[in-house]
């Protein structure tokens, strides 16, 4: 199991577990999610699992800024990706891992709106299929979406595609 403080290096990337703490059995199963920060050069990825906004606020003291790519918490549900997290991290890219036509309508419209107002480029596996981000130390970030259909959603800016929620 992952525990806060674990760290390792591989293939030029530094992996750091930010959550959960050693004593975490009193937390809900969502709040025991593994939160992982991956750094390659100056680019940073943050995966927050299903942690709640309360845990997100605690994590803000641990995260190294800036964050290039954030995998949105809990598939983009309204229980995660709170305003404080969004405004502190201001990620360049946000990825929602959600099933196509999922019953919960993830990502939630409020979450999409928060990231849109923060200027983040947003991608969703529900619409874009498999999304691959490559972090290369000297080249920055490149992205490939298996099923890119920009006509199905609003643009965040001229070079970036936004997602829409069913809610």
Annotate each language-model stretch with its function:
Residues 1-167:
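Non-globular, low-confidence helical/coil segments that flank catalytic cores
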């Amino acid at each position: 199991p992952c525990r806060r403080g674990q760290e390792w290096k591989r293939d030029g990337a530094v992996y750091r577990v930010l959550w959960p703490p050693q004593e975490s059995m009193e937390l809900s199963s969502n709040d025991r999610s593994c939160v992982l920060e991956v750094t390659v050069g100056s680019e940073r990825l943050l995966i927050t699992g299903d942690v709640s906004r309360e845990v997100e606020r605690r994590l803000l003291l641990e995260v190294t800024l800036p964050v290039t790519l954030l995998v949105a918490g809990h598939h983009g549900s309204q229980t995660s990706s709170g305003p404080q997290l969004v405004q502190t991290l201001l990620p360049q890219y946000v990825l929602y891992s959600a099933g196509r036509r999922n019953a919960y309508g993830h990502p939630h419209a409020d979450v999409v709106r928060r990231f849109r107002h923060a200027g983040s480029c947003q991608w969703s596996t529900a619409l874009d299929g498999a999304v691959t981000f490559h972090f290369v130390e000297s080249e920055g970030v490149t992205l490939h979406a298996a099923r890119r259909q920009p006509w199905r959603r609003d643009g965040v800016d001229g070079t970036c595609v936004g997602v829409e929620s069913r809610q």
